[in-house]
UniProtKB/Swiss-Prot annotation:
Bias-annotated ranges (Polar residues): 24-41
Free-text description of this protein's post-translational modifications in UniProt: Phosphorylated in response to DNA damage.
Protein name, entry field: Structure-specific endonuclease subunit SLX4
Quaternary structure (record): Forms a heterodimer with SLX1.
Feature: compositional bias, Pro residues: 277-289
Segments of skewed composition (Basic residues): 151-161
Main localization category: nucleus
Protein's UniProt keywords contain Electron transport: no
Similarity comment: Belongs to the SLX4 family.
Cross-referenced InterPro entries: Structure-sp_endonuc_su_Slx4
Amino acid sequence: MDFHRANRNLQLVESGVSDGRNPESFSLDETQVPVSSGFSSDSDKDQQEQIFINTQVQGRLDEAEEADKVRANLGQFRYDSQDSAISPKHKSAIQRPSARTTKRSSSSQRRKAPTKAQSLLKQLSGKHAKVQDMIKYQQKLDSLAGSQQRAKSKGKTTKTKKQQEKRYDTYNANEWQHIYNLLLEKFPHTRPSEVEDVYQYLYGDESEDQPLWNESQRPIEPESQDLGFLPPPPADKQRVSVLSLSQVMDDKHSREPDEDIIVPDSTDEEYIVIPIPSSPQPLRPPLATKPPLLTKPPLKKVESDAGTPKTAHSPSDGVIDLTNGSFKVVKSLISPLKEETAQVQVPATRMPTLGTTPNLAPTKEQPLRYRLHRSQLESFSAVEGLIVCSPGPSQDDVPVPDTESEDSAAEDHCMVELQPSILASRTPSPSVQSDWNSQSAQQLRQSMKSLGLKTSRSKRQMLHSLQQASQVLEIDTGGQENQRQEIHDYLTSLVQSSPVLLEKVYTFQPIASKELLTKLTEANPFVDVIDEYTIREWADYQGICLTTS
């Protein structure tokens, strides 16, 4: 054991307790490396290096402080021309406004109550900004009109009432009634005076002058001045002189008025000029009197007196002479467009004495027509292919009442048409009926789909539907291409027999599908068997607009 080392350690501990030092406060060099003369050179080197590092850091800090001072001195000259009055310590109070999501209105706008016109326009359109622009533009026009009116009446001493500019709207009576009903539905407690104010705002005050539209609807007043009689046109204006190219280019030829080529007017007939009589006769007969009918003059026997001289008038005279001969009718005055046809006399033996009577029995293609009383239609409602038509009165179908039923009105009767082909094909043939019974339910469904009929689960219902279809259509088991077209033609005939549906189709009005099916089913229950897809396909082909509602 090294006693010298232990003694030395005890001395070090004893000296540390006596000095009052804390072992925790010892540095790393003092605890690990004892202070001796041999380690003095290493500690001096460490101190010198630490001093060198501190000088570098301090130099950097000094440079940073100097740069800050320079920036502070130069910052006051940066915006001297703009912000000279503003203190650099305080920021400007004027800032960019932030985006406002809500639209604020001024206190004056909140205090001002909206007018009835503004509320009405807002209720009708639903766009507040659009209505405000319209009202501002109208107020601008009113202010311009008012300024012009004041400039015109500046020299007058009396104050004239500013005439408001009349405004006309495109609303007719039906549209205004619709608007009036909407206002009453929206505001049930509206007084009639308020509605009248809105009407006067749109159409103006009726107490003032009549609007332009009312003025345009007035009948034309007859002119007070008497037109008198038209003077006869001069004779020289009835003819147009035309020269040919050779006559114009020929300088040696002396042209005279009589040698000109005269081209008559297209309305003149054989150079006839009928002068207007000078007697005071009205040009137009009064409307109350009926115009005289043009009657054919009676034939007159040719006189056998050959000694009496007769003046023969040429067709170009156009003069009616009543002194000599019979009355001569100018054909151009009666019918200027009718051409004269040569009349050939046929001897009496040529004329047939027995005329052929028309065949009154209808053919197979012609429909059978019956005239029935409307009370008897219920008993014939079960007949398939029966078309009820009520045409307008004509000369061919004039109802002649019986002597016993003279009191009955003509409107109580109607005409009924029935096609003979439908009568022949009402019941299916036994071969077709046996084919249906022999087919399975799946085959019946396929055949009904190809025909355009509704399918069902039970075979009995499908056979009943096919039997109803056979009463209207000619069902053939061989081919089924034309049977769908026959259904389309049958639906078209049903629509043609209904005046209400026909009017809607002609005017391109949309028809509800339920309404169409109901009316067609009432006309014939067979429509209830037809598939809805087939009916829509037929409507597309015919241009009928169907709606679901």
